[in-house]
């Protein structure tokens, strides 16, 4: 449910949503016009570290153009990218997404609430939480405030079943409010392994936190059937 809620390609509904917002006028290119008469151009900023994100944006560009939105990708460097977001100069950005690909009731839901400045959809709110109110901005969105409350409730709750209930409420809010737009999930990660290296699983979950990529499969139990000929060890 959470993964597929807004994942369907429905240009008719997307156009209707934009019409309902009052963005009915278009220029000669078919790009919708904002209330001030300017075309609806979106500059999506990236950290410029990989062509994967710009390739994805090229695919999105063609779909969004059909509903009257023109997007441009703007690569930069990570420190510049983050500082622009932290200072509120960025309209929209693209990033790698949620770290926790193995969420359970006992996993922290911190990534789904404004708990840190590093969460790029709400840096000022996250900074406010991180600094105990000394910097940033106090959330003025009731749903974001509820997410923070649920996060605190989860931290104080020792019972697994109640933690699970809290997680479901967090995901319900996060899904309905769409604080970030999910693009891809469950991408296959090919891994090349020597036939000489044994005890490596054929299939697995490739996730950094939790999981540490290969760490979850105890790489200390991997072993070479024969010693590589170019090994310095004898």
State each model region's role:
Residues 39-49, 71-73:
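Short, well-ordered beta-strand elements
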Residues 60-70:
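Short alpha-helix C-terminal cap/hinge motif
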Residues 1, 11-16, 52-62, 82-234:
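Detector for C-terminal structural segments
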Residues 73-83:
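Short helix-initiation/N-cap motifs at beta->coil->alpha
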Residues 6, 71-73, 152-156:
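Short, well-ordered beta-strand elements within core beta-sheets of diverse protein domains
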């Amino acid at each position: 449910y959470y993964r597929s809620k807004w994942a369907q390609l429905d240009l008719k509904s997307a156009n209707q949503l934009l019409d309902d917002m009052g963005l009915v006028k278009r220029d000669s290119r078919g790009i919708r016009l904002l209330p001030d008469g300017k075309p609806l151009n979106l500059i999506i900023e990236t950290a410029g570290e990989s062509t994967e994100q710009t390739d994805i944006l090229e695919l999105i560009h063609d779909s969004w153009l059909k509903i009257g939105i023109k997007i441009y990708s703007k690569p930069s460097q990570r420190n510049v990218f983050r500082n622009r977001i932290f200072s509120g100069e960025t309209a929209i950005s693209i990033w790698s997404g949620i770290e926790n690909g193995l969420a359970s009731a006992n996993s922290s839901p911190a990534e789904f609430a404004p708990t840190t400045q590093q969460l790029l959809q709400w840096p000022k709110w996250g900074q406010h939480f991180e600094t105990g109110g000394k910097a940033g901005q106090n959330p003025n969105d009731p749903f974001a405030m509820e997410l923070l409350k649920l996060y605190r409730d989860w931290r104080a709750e020792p019972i697994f079943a109640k933690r699970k209930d809290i997680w479901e409420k967090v995901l319900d809010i996060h899904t309905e409010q769409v604080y970030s737009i999910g693009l891809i999930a469950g991408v296959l990660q090919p891994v090349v392994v020597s036939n000489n290296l044994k005890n490596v699983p054929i299939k697995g979950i490739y996730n950094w936190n939790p999981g540490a990529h290969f760490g979850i499969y105890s790489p200390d139990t991997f072993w070479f059937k024969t010693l590589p000929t170019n090994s310095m060890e004898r």
